[in-house]
Every structure is written in C-alpha cells, then in structure tokens.
Amino acid sequence: MFTIKEEIANAITHGIGVLLSIPALVFLIIFAANYGSAWDIVSFTIFGVSMLLLYLSSTLLHSITHKKTKDILEIIDHSAIYVLIAGTYTPFLLGPLKGTLGFTLLVIVWSLALGGIVFKIFFVKRFILLSTFVYLVMGWLMIIAVKPLYASLSGAGFSLLFLGGILYSVGTIFYIWKKIPFHHAIWHSFVLGGSAAMFFCVLFYCVKVPFLS
C-alpha cells in the first residue's frame, strides 16, 4: 500500500509521461512518414501508442481510489508493461532488423507479451518477482541481434538503445524494493528515462534522417 503522498508522486511522475507521450507519438508518425516506409509508420505508431497506453493506465491507476475500478486498472497497467516492451521492439524489428531474424523476434516478443497479459488477468497481485524477471528477459532478448543492430544503428543509436535498457533494468530494483519511501515513483522516473532514450533512438536511428547522415 502507498501513502497519499506516494500515490500523488506516482500519479505525477507518469502523468508527465502522458503529457510527453502525446507529442512523442506525433513526432514519431511525422518522422516515419517523411523518412521511412509504410512499415515504419505502422511500427513507429505502435511504439508511440504503447508508451501512451502505459503512462495513461499508470496515471489513472494511481489517481483513482474506487477499489473495483482500481483493480481493473491494475490489470491494464501491468499488462501495458508487456505491451510497451513489445511495442518498443517493433520499430527495430520491422526496420533495422527486418527480414527473417526481425520477424522471428517480432513473433516471439509479441507472443510473450500476449502470454504475459493473460497471466496478469488472473494473477495481477501475485508472482511479482516472476513477472519482473519476465520483463527483464523480454527486454534483453534483443541481445541476440546485437551485431546487426550495432551495424544498423551506428554507435550513437546503439548507445541510446543500451542506455534505455539499463535505465529500465536499474529501475526494476526500486519496483521490488518496497521498503524505500517513494520507491514506486523512483521506478517511474527510471521508466521515463528509459522511454526517452528509446524514443530518440527510434526517432533518429530506425529511419535514415538526412540531417544525421
């Protein structure tokens, strides 16, 4: 259970995410339309919508006190983490890694995401450590394709991708370390940082942007 102050901090941190995700989605679509293909438009949109879904569901969860509504939002919020992970993968797998490897990984991560969502529907308040472990495994599955990714993204793009992964991963420490005051808001802050790194990586390096060439 969170204190009132903690819930306010939880809502504010991801409320900021909602406000940033809306223009982020617009920029993603514009860049994909101007510099990418139809597949890039689809994949960038999926990524942007997955960010917005995560931050919106989280903000609502921490803002509403009605128990039944909160229980439903908790399922959506936890499920949205799986969606964000798979959504973040999508621009890379349909862009820089497109082909057999990209398609295979795409099927794997979205299958894991769907499995995770079904799991959360039934066990949202249980097996937290297991869920966190699955989040991390899904997130770092990309290491399978580290060589072609580095070749496609360049050093700067790959650094942003790696930074995003590190921020998300370090943040999970505070997600499960419940004895620290405001631990959940701290985790939210790491999620924001991870999303920012992934956003700029996708925006500038998953399509060929002329002014960075």
Swiss-Prot record:
The chain crosses the membrane at residues 11-31, 41-61, 75-95, 103-123, 127-147, 157-177, 185-205. It is a multi-pass membrane protein. Keywords: Cell membrane, Membrane, Transmembrane, Transmembrane helix. GO terms for cellular component: plasma membrane. It holds the Pfam family HlyIII. It is found in: Cell membrane. GO terms for molecular function: pore-forming activity. It comes from the Bacteria. Belongs to the UPF0073 (Hly-III) family. This is Hemolysin-3 homolog.
